[in-house]
């Protein structure tokens, strides 16, 4: 487990918003009924150049789309748009390497088991995160 290091921006519903403004209401449908999907992705800096690479970004976003479909959540962005938004938020935060968390969930507006009418919120956050299992993970 690692603490989250705040960065400047989060991509939310097609816009780059300041970290502190990327909030979700406590009565959002997903918070009460678990109606959401997410991915966990890594971006790595190439040690031999000044370039960074997102690991299997297209595959992750395709899986996010499939997961949303299985959960009956209509995702309002294409795979290509989500990939572009991911690169955009990494660049906006000037992160050479990071953890990326895209999440799709039903937002605030309706309550009850039937999610009809609940808006779909899409967020892509990223932040610095070293080795997932800690600095000694590879050695041990």
Feature-to-residue mapping (PLM):
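Conserved alpha/beta cores of soluble small-molecule-handling proteins
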Residues: 1-140
């Amino acid at each position: 487990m690692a603490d989250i290091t705040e960065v400047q921006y989060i991509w939310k519903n097609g816009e780059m918003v300041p970290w502190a403004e990327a909030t979700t209401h406590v009565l959002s449908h997903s918070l009460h009924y678990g109606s959401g999907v997410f991915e966990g992705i890594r971006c790595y800096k190439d040690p031999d150049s000044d370039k960074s690479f997102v690991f299997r970004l297209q595959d992750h976003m395709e899986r996010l789309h499939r997961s949303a479909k299985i959960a009956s959540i209509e995702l309002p962005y294409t795979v290509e748009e989500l990939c572009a938004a991911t690169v955009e938020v990494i660049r906006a935060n000037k992160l050479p390497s990071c953890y990326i968390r895209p999440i799709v969930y039903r937002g605030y507006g309706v309550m009850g088991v039937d999610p009809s009418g609940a808006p779909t919120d899409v967020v892509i956050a990223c932040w610095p995160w070293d080795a997932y299992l800690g600095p000694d993970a590879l050695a041990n």
